[in-house]
Amino acid sequence: MISVSKLYCGGTAESDGLRYGHGGQGPQVGPGAPPTSKTAAQRRPVTVWNVTRTCNLRCIHCYTDSDAKKYSGELTTEEGKTLIRDLADFEIPALLFSGGEPLARPDLFDLVEHARSLGIRPTLSTNGTLITDDTARQIKRAGFTYVGISLDGIGEINDRFRGVGGAFDRAVRGFKACVGVGQRVGLRLTLTRHNFANLHGIFDFIEREHVDRACFYHLVYAGRGGQIADDDLSREETRQAIDVILERTEDFHRRGLNKEILTVDNHVDGIYLYLKLRDKDPARAEQVLKLLTWNGGGMYSSGVGIGDIDFQGNVHADQFWMHHAFGNVRQRPFSRIWTDTSDPLMAGLKDRRAKIKGRCAPGICKWFDACGGAMRVRADLVHNDPWAPEPACYLTDEEIGFTAEKQKMVKARGEDFPMPAFSRPPRRVSPQPASSPPATSCTGGTEA
């Protein structure tokens, strides 16, 4: 995750310590240093548990290819509690209950309360359509620290994306129900050509509905997401989208609207943000680069700082890497599977510097230490090689220092991979409506 609010505008948020060290300021060292002060490489993984594959919607980008039916092999309640005890002993920083649609699982609140009793910080990833006022009260009582509700556009745009009419209205109802009981809640949106042109409308919605947190995800071509890979944004479209996100986040900050805006699943965003900030505030930009480098980007993400357990108990490097399992928690505890590097992929993910190829490799891309090669699973899905360059990198050769000499070197190594998302003619983001306040520069001090 790239916290635009923090890095671009100097804001602060509860979860900054997970991404940027103690207090969001980088690491602390010495006796008694808190868990978030560990280096990014040392931290236990934020763990996603897909508690069920069943879902009441049929989203066109669903990485688990879920549907409204019962799937066999789901971990039982007792198996789930055994898993949770192991995760607690392993001292994971957070457990994200996901799906499918996790609220379709009848024992969800029992599992969450068990996690809370063992000191685990539980969060919920949901489509929001099943959240009534009563459900919101249950969510609050169970002890979820955060609820992320998925929306992928306004009105019919979202419903087409979600595969069910009325999904937008029901998700908004769920969001408001959570707000009504004092539950911390935010929105999750995946950037595609379906919603790209309406980004300003989405930000207007965020302001109008008093959304305090919004995460903008880049498309990953897993599950049904692979069927809509052509709907991913081109390089130019991605730059436009991130520009809008930066501009509107600046405007929120300038007007004193305390909103946490993040981008997810493309660590290139951090470098792009840094380059934009460098032109405006070089001193703060260097502070931002230090935080990005401490975080390590993709280097400490999949297989290191994030992991996944699917509904049948299979362990994956992240929630998009369903095509490769390292083991099953019915046979071995997650803690043992996660620390076992006998699988070449797990070993590589935990020490990937020497493996990443092409324009992303260290010594080729000058931002490797801060980006870390971005999303390895996207490279694997596109190139059938987890160490290939990030297909969704939208920085130019000049921006990453990919000189003609380096290009010859990469070609000589046989690492001249095609970059498939760059060739389409770009669309344009619709202009900001006249009724929306103008975006201006941040004025919030020098905190990175």
Model region roles, listed by residue range:
Residues 4-8, 320-448:
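Flexible mid-to-C-terminal extensions adjoining Fe-S/redox cofactors in radical SAM and related proteins
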Residues 3-146:
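Conserved alpha-helical substructure of the radical SAM core
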Residues 77-98, 104-240:
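Radical SAM/AdoMet-radical enzyme domain recognition
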Residues 236-287, 314-366, 371-372:
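C-terminal accessory region of radical SAM enzymes
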Residues 288-298:
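Short, basic/aromatic recognition patches
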Residues 1-46, 57-58, 253, 261, ...:
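Flexible, acidic/Gly-rich N-terminal and inter-domain linker regions that tether
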Residues 300-303:
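Short, small/polar residue-rich loop motifs at catalytic or cofactor-binding pockets
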